Design a protein with these regions (language model features):
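Acidic, low-complexity Ser/Thr/Gly/Pro-rich repeat segments typical of extracellular/periplasmic
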Residues: 2-129
Length: 129
């Protein structure tokens, strides 16, 4: 057990969009949102944190941009990390976003465990190219 400083609580994953287990997610989805209970976008931790998130289609890792809204720009968004696939999502495919344990809050607390969000896209109204 890691000794905590008085007043410090561990970093927790709160929610995602799309949610874990979602099906019928639009293949036109441009950005997934990951929400935590602490500031994970501060400059002091951002270089590390943007490397702690990966995304796969099935067993194939896909290229993503991991982005934020700086806490100095909009403090209310300090708990959100955004994941943007560089190429569009395929219809009727399973995706997973993995958040690694070394994700760190501004106060130094780490996530401490791997979090996986899985979702499946639905049909595209226009055929995939």
């Amino acid at each position: 057990m890691i000794a905590q400083q008085p007043g410090q609580k561990p970093l927790n994953f709160v929610s995602s969009y799309p949610r874990n287990g979602a099906t019928g997610v639009s293949p036109d989805l441009k950005t997934a949102r990951l929400v935590f209970d602490k500031n994970v976008v501060n400059d002091a931790v951002w270089t590390n944190n943007r490397q702690q998130i990966k995304m796969w289609r099935g067993t194939t890792q896909i290229s993503i941009n991991v982005t934020r809204i700086k806490d100095t720009v909009d403090f209310s968004k300090r708990n959100n990390i955004y994941v943007k696939p560089k190429k569009g999502l395929r219809s009727l495919s399973w995706y997973k976003i993995v958040i690694y344990p070394n994700l760190t809050a501004k106060n130094g607390e780490k996530l401490g465990k791997t979090v996986t969000i899985r979702f499946k896209t639905g049909r595209r109204s226009q055929p995939d190219e």
